Design a protein with these regions (language model features):
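Single conserved hydrophobic/aromatic residue that forms the stacking wall/gate
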Residues: 273-281
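Sec-type signal peptide cleavage vicinity
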Residues: 2-5, 18-274
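Bacterial N-terminal signal peptides
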Residues: 7-14
Length: 281
């Protein structure tokens, strides 16, 4: 079964990150009398740790190799392969009819999300949502579950027909100092107040990535994880930095970021609109 998260095509947002580093808590020692527990996560409206190719204006989200989940403050083994379905093994866990399940690779505790200020992506189309703060939750019954997600996402559909320099990073900042990424505790089906910053940078490594020559409705060029916030009264600044030192700046009206939803930002970049580095004399 394949599921799709429908893209809200809105021009956009801004997002921010948290400057705080936090270690993921270690796997909790299991008390005597526990048994091996296996929970299976299926494709669903919110299930994802990476984007698949878009079809008919929708993007499927899939499990990725290395993913793990939490149940009763205990971490599962990481999965070896991704896909629309994944089986998570807990070597020793208290048996129960239901389990509260969390997908969280970055937070300091199972039910605390941490969306970092510095996010990374190593290549075009190779998204890193889990390590960039993606946070999911579910109730497992009869050994199965389907994730819902408390974080939001932006799909960068950035392209150019004449910019040849590689893109090094994208930085989004929001006016008014609103916190749009950082650390937030999960309770009552949503993330609570977020403690973090009002900007976030998605970096593409030292060499950067080449921009595609045209917009693409099926391949996701880049994506970022965001804290869901009402940015409808904010102004968003988006800075694209290139390997030759040039910069492209956008300013847009903010939008409301909805948990579990993706906002697409289609941006044509023209060489004539770049701010070029100053040549010293």
């Amino acid at each position: 079964m394949k599921n799709y998260l429908y893209i809200l095509c809105a021009f956009l947002l801004a997002f921010a990150g948290c400057t705080k580093d936090a270690d993921v808590e270690p796997i909790a020692p299991a008390p005597d009398g526990n048994t091996q527990v296996v929970l299976t996560g299926f494709s669903g409206r919110g299930t994802r740790t990476g984007f698949g190719g878009a079809e008919d204006g929708a993007v499927p989200f899939l499990w990725s190799a290395g993913d793990y989940i939490w149940a009763r403050n205990t971490r599962s083994e990481a999965i070896a392969e991704g896909g629309s379905q994944a089986t998570f093994v807990f070597e020793s866990l208290e048996t129960a009819d239901t389990y509260d399940v969390f997908y969280n690779l970055t937070g300091p505790a199972a039910a605390t999300a941490l969306i970092p200020a510095e996010q990374t992506q190593q290549a075009a189309g190779e998204l890193n949502l889990g390590q960039n703060g993606d946070f999911g939750y579910a109730t497992a019954q009869n050994g199965t579950f389907t994730l819902e997600h408390a974080t939001s996402y932006v799909w960068f559909d950035t392209y150019s027909s004449d910019v040849t320099s590689n893109l090094l990073s994208i930085t989004l900042s929001v006016s008014g100092g609103q916190t749009i990424a950082g650390e937030a505790a999960f309770a009552d089906g949503k993330l609570g107040d977020c403690k973090g910053s009002s900007s976030v940078t998605l970096s593409f490594g030292e060499e950067g990535v080449a921009l595609p020559s045209q917009s693409n409705d099926t391949d996701v060029f880049a994506a970022m994880v965001l804290y869901p916030a009402d940015l409808s009264t904010a102004t968003v600044s988006i800075v694209y930095k290139f390997a030759d030192g040039s910069v492209y700046l956008q300013t847009k009206s903010g939008k409301t970021l909805t948990p579990g939803h993706t906002l697409r930002l289609s941006t044509p970049v023209s060489y004539t609109h770049l701010t070029l580095p100053t040549t010293p004399y």
